[in-house]
C-alpha cells in the first residue's frame, strides 16, 4: 500500500505558486463574501484556512461580511459590481452555506466564470465535464493533482467514488473520465457498496464518516 501524503504535495504546490507570484508585477487579489457567518462556526474556520493559504503564497485576501438580512437580488447586484470591474479582484468566492431565503444556485451562477475560483458556475461545470480548460472545484482537482504527483495513471483503472455532490463526486467523475478511467459513482442509496469497492483499483470517499471504508472493502493492490 502507498501512503499518499496530501500535505507534502500541497506544500510543494504552494512553494511553486509563491515563486510564480513573486515574479508577477502585482499581487493577485482574492475576494471572499460571507453572509452573516457565525464567528466561531465552520465557515469561519474554512475562510481562515483559505486566508492563511493565500497569504502564504503572496495573494491578498479581502473578506466582505454582509448581513444575513440581505435580499437575494441585492447580493447578486453586489457580485455584479465585481463582474463588471475586473480590476477589483482576480477571484471571487461566496462562502457557503447561505441563509435559507437565498438561492445558492442563483448566487453562484451570478459570479463571472472568470472569477469563479471555486469552479461552481454552471459554465465551469460544463467545461469540466467536456474536458476543457476552466476553473475546477478544488477538492476534485486536488485529488487529481495528488495522483499525478505520485505518478498514478488512472487510464483503464476502475475508480469508485463514494460521493455525488457538485463539489466533489460529480466533478471528480468527469476529471477521471477525461483521463480514461472507468468510473462508478456511489452514494447513500447505492446497493452493496462493499462489493462495488472490492472490484476497485482506486477508491475515493467523501462521506464525512470516519472509518467508513473497512479493510475488507479493499482488494489487494488497490
Regions found by a protein language model. Give the residues of each.
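Short beta-strand elements in bilobed, periplasmic/extracellular small-molecule ligand-binding domains
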Residues: 54-68, 183-185
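Non-catalytic terminal and connector segments of soluble metabolic enzymes
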Residues: 56, 84, 111-114
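Short, well-structured alpha-helical segments in soluble
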Residues: 74-87
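Short, Asp-centered acidic motifs that coordinate Mg2+ and/or phosphate
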Residues: 90-91, 202
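Anion-binding alpha/beta catalytic cores of soluble intermediary-metabolism enzymes, centered on
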Residues: 93-154, 172
Amino acid at each position: 500500500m502507498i501512503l499518499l501524503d496530501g500535505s507534502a504535495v500541497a506544500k510543494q504546490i504552494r512553494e511553486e505558486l509563491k515563486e510564480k507570484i513573486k515574479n508577477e508585477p502585482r499581487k493577485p487579489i482574492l475576494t471572499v463574501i460571507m453572509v452573516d457567518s457565525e464567528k466561531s462556526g465552520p465557515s469561519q474556520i474554512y475562510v481562515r484556512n483559505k486566508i492563511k493559504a493565500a497569504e502564504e503564497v503572496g495573494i491578498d485576501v479581502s473578506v466582505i461580511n454582509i448581513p444575513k438580512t440581505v435580499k437575494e437580488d441585492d447580493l447578486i447586484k453586489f457580485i455584479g459590481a465585481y463582474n463588471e470591474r475586473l480590476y477589483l479582484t482576480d477571484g471571487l468566492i461566496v462562502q457557503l452555506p447561505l441563509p435559507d431565503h437565498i438561492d445558492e444556485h442563483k448566487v453562484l451562477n451570478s459570479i463571472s466564470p472568470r472569477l469563479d475560483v471555486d469552479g461552481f458556475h454552471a459554465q465551469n461545470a460544463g467545461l469540466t465535464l467536456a474536458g476543457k480548460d476552466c476553473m475546477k472545484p478544488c477538492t476534485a482537482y486536488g485529488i487529481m493533482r495528488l495522483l499525478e504527483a505520485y505518478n498514478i495513471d488512472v487510464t483503464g483503472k476502475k475508480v469508485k467514488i463514494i460521493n455525488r455532490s457538485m463539489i466533489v463526486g460529480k466533478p471528480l467523475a468527469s476529471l477521471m473520465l477525461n483521463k480514461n478511467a472507468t468510473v462508478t459513482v456511489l452514494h447513500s442509496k447505492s446497493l452493496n457498496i462493499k462489493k462495488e469497492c472490492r472490484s476497485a483499483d482506486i477508491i475515493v470517499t467523501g462521506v464525512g464518516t470516519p472509518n467508513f471504508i473497512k479493510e475488507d472493502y479493499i482488494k489487494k493492490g488497490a
